[in-house]
Amino acid sequence: MSSKKEPVYWNSVDYTSDEKINRYNALFNNSKSKIIGESTTSYMFYSNFILRVRKHFKKSPKFIFILRNPVDRCYSHYWYLVGRGQENRSFKTSFTNDAKREFSHYGDLPNYYYHFGRYAHWLEAFYSNFESKNIKIITLEDLKINPLKTINSCFSFLSISELTTLSPIKSNVTVRLKYPKLYHLNRKILAGKYSITKFSKYLISKKQRVYLKNRLQTNTFFKTHKPLNYPELSEQDRSLIKSYYENDVKRLKELTGHAFNGWCDFNN
């Protein structure tokens, strides 16, 4: 896999520039594997991704999608942004407001709680442009319950040797940042969001800028946090969120041929 988990290369406006191509290829320089890949989740939501892949790949790549019950997914997503200091509205308000707006390309605030869970809506484009034999669907629920079997099904899909044992998989833990404002200021500085950071290239050498950026990225002070134990979703809100996704999940089952038995909300 790429040395950077989510390169977001194929979403870039200037993805064909020599600089972007070289940086992307460098993410795989240490790989001696027959198969390489990466895991940028936002590719699922950008139509340009499919157009660009079809244009530049003679042979279709393979896609593995890990889907989670959309009700649980959006609630976890909400608390993730709360912990980062990027959300202060109630969950119900955040979700319903998102459902009322159109989806558009996003940057530092990926608060599409409703839209990200419209799996059938997003996957239809993949099934329309690539053969189903090149698309693998697994669920987070199956990955947690039977990780070895689920991962081996992916290995089989990729035509590589299956595993006999598997080390425990550590799940992501929702946290609350101790200094969220400093954390986001740091991220914006690194991304060059402020005029002063854009102007700095005329005052500081590229080598010095790279050094400072690396120091900021590795400074754990900005990422200081503690576990965030959030409340369970109420039955009333759970029923409401379910109603938003019922038609999409029904279409998802038809599209993929999967029953999604682990999603109890949609299999009563």
Regions found by a protein language model. Name each.
Residues 1-268:
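Anion-recognition interface
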